[in-house]
Amino acid sequence: MANSRTVLILCGDYMEDYEVMVPFQALQAFGITVHTVCPGKKAGDSCPTAVHDFCGHQTYFESRGHNFTLNATFDEVDLSKYDGLVIPGGRAPEYLALTASVVELVKEFSRSGKPIASICHGQLILAAADTVNGRKCTAYATVGPSLVAAGAKWVEPITPDVCVVDGSLITAATYEGHPEFIQLFVKALGGKITGANKRILFLCGDYMEDYEVKVPFQSLQALGCQVDAVCPEKKAGDRCPTAIHDFEGDQTYSEKPGHTFALTTNFDDLVSSSYDALVIPGGRAPEYLALNEHVLNIVKEFMNSEKPVASICHGQQILAAAGVLKGRKCTAYPAVKLNVVLGGGTWLEPDPIDRCFTDGNLVTGAAWPGHPEFVSQLMALLGIQVSF
């Protein structure tokens, strides 16, 4: 994309899983080049992430998230080549705020006046770099006293999706604020979003893959789309548990518990014809959703009306069960090849695993590493553009 942008994400061990991956993949989907670095690590190394979620206790709980692979080397970073900086939250900022090279990097970005977007506990690094003195900012509530001590004009996060802008500084309280957080960052980079007045429906289920619902969901929200999520036998406000599927050297993916995902609409009240596109996440949910006639009828309705349908990983099990793959070119997670072939689809090998394909109104992807292309191809079908 002509005149696009390049941004840097400052990573660390046990940064929050969503707070690194959602901006990382959303920004790439919008045509922005994104580099990720961690002090003491090189391109190809990985950082373990943390899942932070709420289950009724007085504070969040933590469990292991995905392994996040870095694509650049910290010691080789030339800050003059970057147009903006993103700082995820989680536990990583606690120790990164004590790392001199990290603090100096943030100071240099601040002096340049380039946009800095920091979320949740990431603002601890901003405080250590003396970049919040006299500036309005928010953060996860427990970070407030540190920011006040650093001279910030503290904005209380009344809701978890609060975002605050002060000049080139964008801050947010938690990953629930990602849609506005990312949209504000794109705007600060000089981006313009057009064609996003669309309504998108997500077909969800228990133990869908964590990234495969949250990344496209919040990416589309960040563009300005109205995005709804439904699940059979559940209502608005109910939650679906998710599964973290990762590649850790075994013969197949591993599974760990992920975040819980909040639904926005009652399944039984759904008027599917009011939506412009359908998204089907992968994970284990499609195995049982493919047995639900109401779900299959929704898929048939979208395909028969030639509205965009985007399905990833194991989501194509639902497409096969709905009988909509006959004569269509399609990829999926490799283990789903049998479903695709038996369903009459023409199998497209996902090599590499982040390959995505568009055949008419159908976008298919193999796994969550392909989200940037997956979301980008859906944007193309919907006529949504991000320009700089």
Swiss-Prot record:
UniProt-listed InterPro entries: C56_PfpI-like, Class_I_gatase-like, DJ-1/PfpI
Activity at various pH: Optimum pH is 6.8.
Gene Ontology, cellular component aspect: cytosol
Catalytic activity: (R)-S-lactoylglutathione = methylglyoxal + glutathione
GO molecular function: glyoxalase III activity; lactoylglutathione lyase activity
Effect the entry attributes to changing residue 314 to A: Reduces catalytic activity 3-fold. Almost abolishes catalytic activity
EC annotation from Swiss-Prot or TrEMBL: 4.4.1.5
Modified positions (Cysteine sulfenic acid (-SOH)) in chain numbering: 120
Family annotation (CDD domains): GATase1_PfpI_1 (cd03169)
A Pfam family this chain is assigned to: DJ-1_PfpI
Residue intervals of the PfpI endopeptidase domain: 5-190, 198-383
Temperature dependence: Optimum temperature is 45 degrees Celsius.
Purpose: Possesses glyoxalase I activity. Catalyzes the conversion of hemimercaptal, formed from methylglyoxal and glutathione, to S-lactoylglutathione. May be involved in oxidative stress response.
Family per record: Belongs to the peptidase C56 family.
Known partners and oligomeric status: Homotrimer.
UniProt protein name: Protein DJ-1 homolog D
Gene encoding the protein: DJ1D
